[in-house]
């Protein structure tokens, strides 16, 4: 394993996680590469591959608006030679009812910035149903 690559990935993810915990939107946005790609699974209107920082961040902002998501905790950060992972717990709102979900966020890093993310939700069906219901 390339220790320098995993160290760089861990450094980037740790910086991102600190900004996320602090709710520092400017610092969060500075962690993304201009060519960032978001892989959002499921069958919701937000599902798909979103290429480019602007397009990907628009989807993330739309998810935040629809779900009223709130970070509860980042339980772990890990890094290997080619990917890093953040395990997060968030609260989302479904029909005004708060629900806690675990999310696994797998990242690729390039130029010391987040270059790609695969979002894996604990209950994809629940997420899809919530996103289908919220249309405003």
Where are these regions (language model features)?
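Short, cysteine-centered beta-strand-loop-beta hairpins and adjacent loop/turn segments enriched
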Residues: 92-100
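Short, low-complexity N-terminal intrinsically disordered segments enriched in polar/charged residues
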Residues: 1-34, 131-136
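Short beta-strand edge/turn micro-motifs at domain boundaries
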Residues: 102-130
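Short, surface-exposed coil-to-beta transition loops
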Residues: 71-72, 99-105
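Hydrophobic pocket/interface hotspot
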Residues: 16, 28-29, 36, 52, ...
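A short hydrophobic beta-strand element
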Residues: 81-90
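Short beta-strand segments enriched in hydrophobic/aromatic residues
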Residues: 32, 90-92, 105, 120-121
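A solvent-exposed, acidic/Ser-Thr-rich amphipathic alpha-helical stretch
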Residues: 25-27, 33-81
């Amino acid at each position: 394993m390339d220790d320098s690559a995993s160290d760089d990935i861990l450094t980037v993810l740790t910086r991102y996680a600190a900004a996320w915990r602090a709710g520092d939107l400017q610092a969060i946005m500075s962690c993304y590469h201009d060519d960032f790609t978001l892989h959002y699974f499921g069958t919701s209107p937000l599902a798909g591959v979103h290429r480019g920082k602007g397009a990907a961040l628009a989807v993330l902002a739309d998810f935040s608006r629809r779900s009223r998501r709130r970070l509860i905790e980042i339980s772990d950060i890990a890094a290997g030679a080619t990917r890093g992972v953040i395990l997060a717990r968030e609260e989302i709102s479904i029909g005004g009812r708060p629900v806690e979900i675990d999310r696994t966020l797998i990242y690729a890093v390039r130029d010391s910035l987040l270059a790609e993310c695969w979002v894996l939700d604990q209950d994809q069906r629940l997420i899809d149903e919530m996103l289908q219901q919220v249309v405003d």
